[in-house]
Design a protein with these regions (language model features):
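Metal-dependent phosphoesterases centered on the DNase I-like endonuclease/exonuclease/phosphatase
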Residues: 10-15, 88-181
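Active-site environment of divalent metal-dependent phosphoester hydrolases
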Residues: 1-5, 77, 115-116, 160, ...
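Surface-exposed cleft-lining segments at the edges of enzyme active sites
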Residues: 45-47, 71-89, 125-129
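Structured beta-strand-rich core segments of catalytic domains in phosphoester-bond hydrolases
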Residues: 1-76
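Short hydrophobic/aromatic beta-strand or adjacent loop that forms the aromatic wall/cage
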Residues: 27-29, 53-58, 178-182, 210-216
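Conserved beta strand-loop-helix elements of the APE1-like EEP
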Residues: 25-40, 160, 172-193, 219
Length: 223
């Protein structure tokens, strides 16, 4: 959504600060906080050409550097958008290398449009030659993690079929045909403070829900 229609006033009435980077009906990311929002950066801000799509926003909230991401979908392996997706992820890794320190408390949260491994899809056989599970995508995600990021949900839960996304079509939610593509990746100093992680399936059961379920993470305050 555009900045003009983002519900800033509604969040403010509930005691939240918010910042939003949107692009019409197609793309958008936001950060909403009760512990302050400082040092906001929209996009990569790396000195190169701006990203043509609104997919990344950074802010510091309560001493934690937070990024909200909406990683490109990729569409299909032979689509230009797939190459854009891989380049986008590599660009994010370069920003981490040049701007941030893996020792600092930092989290990159959002829709990654990648299932990290085969536990995170309902049937790997259904995804042969498909996006979201291709090896280049998973390698790009692993490169982000190799910088110093922990998948906090997967650290706590090892089993499969813990999905955050289900297609609207064909009753996929009720058939448990989903994927886990919404992630909280945190540096170790923050991941060590993780106290609870949850995918809220109940939010997916309502009338006219999103095709994604919220992924929640609780962290203790720094001592």
């Amino acid at each position: 959504m555009t900045e003009q229609v983002f519900p800033t006033a509604a969040f403010s009435a509930l005691g939240y600060e918010s910042v939003h980077h949107g692009q019409g009906q197609w793309n958008g990311v936001a950060i909403i906080s009760k512990v302050g929002i400082d040092d906001v950066v929209m996009g990569f801000a790396d000195g190169d050409e701006p990203d043509p799509e609104a997919r990344l926003i950074w802010a510091t909230c309560g001493g934690v550097r937070v990024a909200s991401v909406y990683v490109p979908n990729g569409r299909s392996l032979d689509d230009d958008h797939y190459q854009y997706k891989l380049a986008w992820l590599e660009r994010l890794r370069r920003v981490l290398d040049t701007t941030y320190d893996p020792a600092q408390p930092l989290a990159i949260c959002g829709d990654y449009n990648i299932a990290p491994d085969d536990r995170d899809v309902w049937d790997p056989a259904d995804f042969v030659d498909a996006t979201h599970v291709s090896q280049p995508e998973r390698d790009a995600l692993r490169r982000l993690q190799d910088w110093g990021l922990v998948d906090v949900f997967r650290r706590r839960y090892d089993e499969g079929e813990l999905f955050s996304w289900w297609d609207y079509r064909g009753g996929s939610f009720h058939k448990r045909k989903g994927m886990r593509i919404d992630l909280i990746l945190a540096t170790e100093s923050l991941a060590a403070r993780s106290t609870a992680d949850l995918i809220d399936r109940n939010a997916r059961k309502g009338k006219l829900p999103s095709d994604h379920a919220p992924v929640l993470g609780d962290f203790s305050e720094a001592t």
